[in-house]
Every structure is written in C-alpha cells, then in structure tokens.
Amino acid sequence: MGLDPGWAEDFQRRFDEERAKIGRFNILICGKTGVGKSTLINAIFGSDVAPTGNGVPVTVDTEYFAHDRLPVGVFDTKGFETGEHGDTILERLGVEISRRRQGPINDQVHAVWYVVRSGDRRFEDSQAGFVTRLAAFDLPVLIVLSQVPVRDGHIHPDAIELAAAIESRGLPTQPGPAPILTNARVDPWVTPELCGLHELLDATAEVIPASVRAALEAAQRIDLQRKRRRAKLAIRAATTAAAGTCAVPLPIADAAALFPVQMGMLAAVSAAYGVPTPSSRLVQAFGSIVMATGASTIGRYLAGTIVKFVPGAGSVTGFVIKAGVASSVTLAMGYGWMAVNERLVRMTDEEAAAFLGSDGVKDAFVAAFRDAWTNRKKLAAEIEQDPQ
C-alpha cells in the first residue's frame, strides 16, 4: 500500500508558507573589478549565488541575482572605477533603491557591502566619497577588506595598516567606521586561512531590518548555531501546540490529529535551515521514513512510534495520548528532522540527492529521534530557556 498522498501536498503547502514567512534578504555588493565580490558572497552563502550566470539587469551598471531555492538575492555592480563612472552608478543606484523602497520588503535593498582588496594598500578619496553617498541612501553600508593575508591567526601588518587608515576617516558605515577584515578563499601560498566571515555575518545581521534577519540566517552557510536557534523556536511552538491538542487525552488510534502541528513544525525547521533542496525531495525523504516503519498512513506511523517509545503504551487500541507524551514525541520528531536538515546544508546538490534517496536519511532521523526521546526532559528545558 502506498503512502497517503494528501500529507505530501500539505507538506508542500506548509513549506511554501514557511519560506514565504522568512522572505528574502538582498545585499548590494560594490567594489572594483577583481576585489573578490563573488568569492565573498559564495563563501557566506555556500552556493553559487553571486554572478555565475546571467542576472536580471536593474540598471545599466547593476544586475540582480536571486537564488532559486535560497532566500537571498545579490545586487552586483559590474565592477566600477572611481570618478565619473562611479558617479553615474551612484545616480542610477539611488533611483533604483528609492523605487524599490516603495515596494515589498523582499524586493528592497537591505544592506551594502563595499569591498576593498587589501592588496591595493590604499583607500582613495573618491572611494570614501562613494561610501558616504551610499550611506546617504539610508542604507547600512559595511566596508569589507577582502583577500587579507592571514597565517597562524596573524593578519598581515599591511592589511592592519590599511584598515586603520580607513577607520580614521570616520565614514558613516555600520556598525562602526572600522572595516571588517576577511579572507574568503584559502590559498596555501598567499592566504592559507579563512578569516572574518563570521564577523561579517554578525555585523550584517546586526544592522539589517529585523524583518529580513530570518532570511539571512536561513541563507547563510557558515553559522549552524543561528539555524539551530531558529529551528528550536519552531519546535518549541509545536510542542506547546501538541500538548494543547492533547489537553484532553487523545485515543492513540486518533494520533493523526497531532500531525498538522508536526507537519508545520517540519516545514518550519526546513525553512529555518534554508536547505537548497527541492521541497519535493524533502517530502519524499520523510515519506521514506514513514514507509520504512511499515506504516501506510501518518496516523499509523505516529501511533506505532508512540507504542514503541512510550512505556506502558501497550497496544494502539488501549492507550490514550496525554499532553506530556504528545509534546515529547513532537519534540523528538523535531530534533530528528533537524538532524536530517543539518546534514543536508553541509552537502553539495549531488550529495544531497544521493543522501535523500538512500537509507541514510532514515538512519539519521531515527538516531536523532531516539537520542532526543532519551534526553527529552533536558531538551524541553533547553528550548524553553532559549531566547526568542
């Protein structure tokens, strides 16, 4: 017997809804040709987000690249030189920024990274003027020093000197006048260590509108703790709702009544992780978990899970689900699904497709479910203490 297709449609709908709630984070990235803008973007977001194909022109000098499955978009100036060309770009950008500000938040520009290559060893007056005029558009502008030589945790003195010179200008940048020193690509001969990426992510999250912070956290690929916090909020909400569903004990045969709550949780967890995997594959992955238990419906799956893990549950016909059991099973499912998503965000598209089509997805889910069930009291206390 095949799995009831209705829940798959529900998951797709809920996942689309959760992604829509998260929205989209848009970054404008500026800098001379060759400063490493694309490398920096792709290091933070872990995918070919920045100009690797054809973008959508928004001005003569600027294109917009939106990832088809990650909640991020990049406005990229095509590499400018200072002087008259820079002035022209600024005029066109100002018009475009103002126009977008009148529309939906997902279409607006939320922050600017102005990238300066550390190897240039100078920051010109025209560059300072460009930054000042960008900030006058009422956008948070962050100066990013790129390709910074780092070895054994020590930054090259020339990069430190350039950063100090930029800071001394007191430009209206955020979160302060000091540039953020980064290296986004390892080169064993020149810059053998990454640096500054977490600092850039933290600074960007600090200065952007709160309404798009969830999109930034979902899209980025370097800080899993941010994703975990967001996913745990979804689990906490679902465990509370599940307990409410069973405030009056629910016959175990009616366990499917819990699934709308849990379905929403699963969708919210995947959205929080920003998994760049087609949602149809996520549906198939959870379907394989259910089918592997021998169940043909979600109700039977939940009932079987409760009978298996809850002491004294006995048989499907002789047990009722109380609030504590409902919230604990929901919590364990949430952590099991977190484990699957956490594996996915570390994978390439090819690795993710292979993982979702294998027993590995079921094994990861079940192992994390068992661990969460064993430690359910501790985990429940932890998610209650996590800040909103």
Question: Where do the model's predicted regions map?
Answer:
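Conserved protein kinase catalytic core
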Residues: 48, 82-85, 120-123, 152-153, ...
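Conserved C-terminal guanine-recognition region of P-loop GTPase G domains, centered on the G4
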Residues: 69, 91-176
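Conserved G1/Walker A P-loop phosphate-binding module
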Residues: 1-84, 267, 273-276, 329, ...
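Residue-level preference for well-ordered alpha-helical positions
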Residues: 42, 167-168, 270, 307
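Canonical P-loop GTPase G-domain recognition
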Residues: 2-4, 9, 139-142, 147-214
